[in-house]
Swiss-Prot record:
One of its GO terms (cellular component) is extracellular region. Disulfide bonds join 3-17, 10-22, 16-34. Pfam families: Toxin_12 (PF07740). The keyword Secreted applies. Expressed by the venom gland. Neurotoxin. Causes spastic paralysis and death in mice. Moderate inhibitor of L-type calcium channels (Cav1/CACNA1). This is U4-ctenitoxin-Pr1a. GO terms for molecular function: calcium channel regulator activity; ion channel inhibitor activity; toxin activity. It comes from the Eukaryota. Keywords: Calcium channel impairing toxin, Disulfide bond, Ion channel impairing toxin, Knottin, Neurotoxin, Secreted, Toxin, Voltage-gated calcium channel impairing toxin. The presence of a 'disulfide through disulfide knot' structurally defines this protein as a knottin. It is found in: Secreted. InterPro entries: Huwentoxin-1.
Amino acid sequence: IACAPRGLLCFRDKECCKGLTCKGRFVNTWPTFCLV
């Protein structure tokens, strides 16, 4: 699974580099931003 650094676009099949899931201001909307 690819990881996205904080602040970059994060897709359903990606996770943040810290091992957390993608977070965004909109729920269930992709792509979203990796905030954590």
